[in-house]
Swiss-Prot record:
GO terms for cellular component: host cell plasma membrane; membrane; virion membrane. HAMAP family: INFV_M2 (MF_04069). It is found in: Virion membrane; Host apical cell membrane. It comes from Influenza A virus (strain A/USA:Iowa/1943 H1N1). When the channel is activated, one or more imidazole moieties of His-37 probably become bi-protonated. This is Matrix protein 2.
């Protein structure tokens, strides 16, 4: 017996659910959560580059530079920027002989 036949059964030539009590608070809550999950998933797929770039670069804060000389701060910024630049290059050229 498959899971499909246990959950959904043909009713008068149509596929339907045998949930007669759809006003149950648990069913309503599950429906709302399911709809919200679908909306968030669609938004994530549409804007994933913007969202993850924001989290990756925008929300990261380096260690406190209080009391650190300006030359060391500049060196740290250059290191961080070079790491970001290296991270953005996703493609590698490989030549085969």
């Amino acid at each position: 017996m498959s899971l499909l036949t246990e959950v959904e059964t043909p009713i008068r030539n149509e596929w339907g659910c045998r949930c007669n009590d759809s006003s149950d608070p648990l069913v309503v809550a599950a429906s709302i959560i399911g709809i919200l999950h679908l909306i968030l998933w669609i938004l994530d797929r549409l804007f994933f580059k913007c969202i993850y770039r924001l989290f990756k670069h925008g929300l990261k804060r380096g260690p406190s530079t209080e009391g650190v000389p300006e030359s060391m701060r500049e060196e740290y910024r250059k290191e961080q920027q070079s790491a970001v630049d290296a991270d953005d290059s996703h493609f590698v050229n490989i030549e085969l002989e």
